[in-house]
Amino acid sequence: MDTFPSLFLYSLTIQNSNYVQSSCAASLSGKKAQEIVIATESRLLIYKVDATDGRMNCILNQNCFGIIRNVAPLRLTGFKRDYLVVTSDSGRITILEYNVEKNKLVPIYQETFGKSGIRRVVPGEYLAIDAKGRAAMIASVEKNKLVYVLNRDSEANLTISSPLEAHKANNICFHLIGLDTGYANPIFAALEVDYSEIDHDSTREAFTSSEKVLSYYELDLGLNHVVKRWSKVVDRNSYMLIPVPGGNDGPSGTLVISNGWISYRHLQKAFHQIPILRRQAASANAISTPWNQVNSNSANDGPLIVSAVLHKMKGSFFYLLQTGDGDLLKLTIEHDGQGNVVELRLKYFDTVPLAVQLNILKTGFLFVATEFGNHQLYQFENLGIDDDELEITSLDFQAQDNEVGTKNVHFGVRGLQNLSLVEEIPSLYSLTDTLLMKAPSSGEANQLYTVCGRGSNSSLRQLRRGLETTEIVASELPGAPIAIWTLKLNQTDVYDSYIILSFTNGTLVLSIGETVEEISDSGFLSSVSTLNARQMGRDSLVQIHPKGIRYIRANKQTSEWKLPQDVYVVQSAINDMQIVVALSNGELVYFEMSDDVEGGQLNEYQERKTLTANVTSLALGPVQEGSRRSNFMCLACDDATVRVLSLDLYTTLENLSVQALSSPANSLCIIPMNVNGVSTLYLHIGLMNGVYLRTVIDVTSGQLLDTRTRFLGPRAVKIYPITMKNQNTVLAVSSRTFLAYSYQQNLQLSPIAYSAIDHASSFASEQCPEGIVAIQKNTLKIFTVDSLQDDLKSDIYPLICTPRKIVKHPNFPVLYILQSERNFDSFKYAQENGDVGSSYTKEKQNEHTSKSWVSFISVFDMISKKIIHESPLGDNEAAFSMTAAFFKNRDEFFLVAGSATNMDLECRTCSHGNFRVYRFHDEGKKLELISHTEIDGIPMALTPFQGRMLAGVGRFLRIYDLGNKKMLRKGELSAVPLFITHITVQASRIVVADSQYSVRFVVYKPEDNHLLTFADDTIHRWTTTNVLVDYDTLAGGDKFGNIWLLRCPEHVSKLADEENSESKLIHEKPFLNSTPHKLDLMAHFFTNDIPTSLQKVQLVEGAREVLLWTGLLGTVGVFTPFINQEDVRFFQQLEFLLRKECPPLAGRDHLAYRSYYAPVKCVIDGDLCEMYYSLPHPVQEMIANELDRTIAEVSKKIEDFRVRSF
């Protein structure tokens, strides 16, 4: 009996989440340069900042296969570079070293200290490092603290001790830092509360009298022991600690942050405190910041500091503290040089988006890891020393006095003055809904429309696969060229001098300078069409045309190689020293250049090779440094073959290998590319049928190996060599344009986000050193590829407040975005000002109540790419659901929005629910409200259903039809225990998702207008989204980051669909206090992100459909079904070997990670499989041998799944 699963999936991440869990500035490369280290949920990224233009370049993106909790730099005295200390859910503290040569993080130590997972008593939530790198303390939220002593051995290698315990039962830790004590014993400061009495007091008196304590834990390096050295009661509202530089740099100690106050405390040192500056209630010069519109501090509460960063300079230091409104405050500490603080000074600095973490680089950059929206890099323009901003001092505020009194502590918000924005890193957090559709303008590539963000920092984003480009020049030409080249005049030139444009009846030469203009003294024949052109030798140029070859020397002297009247050139190829041409009579002619005479000359090889098929393309390999010729050439013929010929001195034009193709080749290119640190010679082939091939040429034998295939589009593929980012790349032009390049030592093929082009060439000038010049019909264009790091381009369209749902018009390219926000004033204020968007971002920032709501629908035109209409909902309405439903009784589509009036999120109650029905006008660009219906619950889910509408109102599933004035209820079922979050429909089958109790299958019986529940899940799942994969199979996600597939048993499915089965379904005996039948679990996988949307789509033309999912943190991934069992067994074995040979970076067990809440089932982790590329060659070879494959075959298998998926 075959027990092999009928469903097996391959999980692959398309776009990683960029939500920052932790970040730091560190010198990992040891070259006196600083990098920014970003820890997302499961990845470590290293960014290098270019000091000249502020561009952030990602040099490393490494998957840890675990949940990262904290990351911090560590450097012992005398070391030249930093290590990284990482805490995660692995139950281990990990110390990583950055290997510059291999460009990877390598674990030095993985010290186990406790259980895996994230628990309140497992250390790792807090991480503190001694300023001199001598010790590290990790702490849990409750009870446990561990100290590790760090040292060096006799060979100057880092060593780590066994952990020293500093546990205390019934103790909650709120924050932990390492103090700067110079070379004295390391001290760690913790903010703690002892709840031993609170836990046993039912009167709550112990709670009201409890005290928050600042405790110092000292590590005695001599005795190798940790003791609590000092404790001091602090304000109960204290929540954050900031270390103060010590030793020769400052007075040491800690800053204690509480609600509205900053205080300085240290051992036997004077106490100082200063209030946190507040915004003026209504400032004449105040500007709005879109990140502080929601949850701003009320006038009665003191400001809260949410993040802080210390910057040391020679002889001084200062802090930047960020409030909950996004305002940066500059704090300086004046001290007497003897370890005593004189005063604290505080002033307003600038306003930036709300940050999870702030990092300052020594080169003068501030990195803001934002909570919502794109992360930002700022450059310091000033330090705020000589400005007119109000500066307050702690000398004006008496110790232990927590009342501001009448003193002026208010400032007015202004635009950026001390900082300037130089770079952004895209982030999709928080991603709430997604739609995949074909773009109306391109008609070629699927595009992803997402709504993300919170408050006025929300946006609609159009994601499409493609490297981002910048257009520099677009100029019309007198005709449509058939080819283009750029030429240098000398072999050593850095920049190009000529652009050669070939037309059907002539050639145009343009000179490149400050401007591009036509010239006539280049030596090129302008009366003929040019087939090929290139700079050869030291300073010569070559023009190949149908009737021969024109050789142009530096002094403009020319020589010609001419053909007889009835013979002409059909194809040609040129490199630095060689030329090969294919003639119309079937002959192949080969030339070599000699530098024996001044200016060089071309020497024809006397034996011509006769071919039996017509040549469609030729290619010559590059001439290596120190060599006089390339040893290989390739030719493609119309018999759908490609051949490799020898150009060796003794075997010239002899066949070395041949490969059959699926279609005649249209274009060839031989170019070396760097893969895994090794230069490999590749042959790139573009076929007539739109297929692109890449194959390796064995430099010893000339054999063609390891062929990779990709369908690019319906047009024939043209191949152009391009120099990009100091590497050899290849441009493949079809109906879309793709770039083949090497990124992080792996070959990638990505589309470029640019309109379709016809011909292209490299372009280098002083203004544009690495560009591409292209022909688009009769237009000359010059553009650049901005970065090779991210091949998912994002276009951003700002929204007013938090988006909830996105819906497309059934027939027109129009999107409808449902938005709602808590803590906003009535929407009427925006209408009175005449501009919805600006009113919410420019006025009345702090005038809101804690339970007020605003909701409206924005209409987005996908053609003009802007919001063209906004329709507000009623006062204090919270909107959650929307759908475009077809009502059969009206024979047209309507937009229906579901909302709740006076919604209380904590209690999940409301005055009443609402249905608002809108009619489409002007091809969906305008909405007309035609119906408003009040209902008795909160409509959390809406979907069209057989000419009517299904609504999930609380725990009830209802059928509604559109009446003349109201929505009419036509049927109802108490479908779930709590409340419905999602509804999926196929034919008469309905799947309803409950907030806690997984999903239930419902069947609709139209004969009796009955809804019947007939199957549900065996366990509880907190479902967030789901989609029907087929009639019986459902894919869903839950709030804990799992994606799963459930299938209704075949006999149960048939029973539910049978006619007259209603009575049997009603009277069947319940099983496990629920429905009579249970769903079977087919697959289960932990993604480490909360799925917010699932769609069954086809992302690659000609490939199978996949499951596309997006997560709240911004992750985009796919699940691809396996076609045969052989592939499943191959990847299962590969996954097993990789778990053993490539253990996760932070020490987490991979199988346990992917089985976080339930065992992983019938899913292969494609992200782990792709780690095969980064393994050393001996390990790759060992794994390939275990699989009875070659390294190339294993790599091809892995690559094929990514190609077929996205």
Curated annotation (Swiss-Prot):
Signal peptide: none
GO molecular function, one term: U2 snRNA binding
Record-linked Pfam families: Beta-prop_RSE1_1st, Beta-prop_RSE1_2nd, CPSF_A
Domain of life from the UniProt record: Eukaryota
Any one Gene Ontology cellular component term annotated for this protein: nucleus
Tagged with keyword Nucleus: yes
InterPro entries: Beta-prop_RSE1/DDB1/CPSF1_1st, Cleavage/polyA-sp_fac_asu_C, RSE1/DDB1/CFT1/CPSF1, WD40/YVTN_repeat-like_dom_sf, WD40_repeat_dom_sf
Keywords annotated in UniProt: mRNA processing, mRNA splicing, Nucleus, Spliceosome
Subcellular location as annotated: Nucleus
Name listed for the protein in its UniProt record: Pre-mRNA-splicing factor prp12
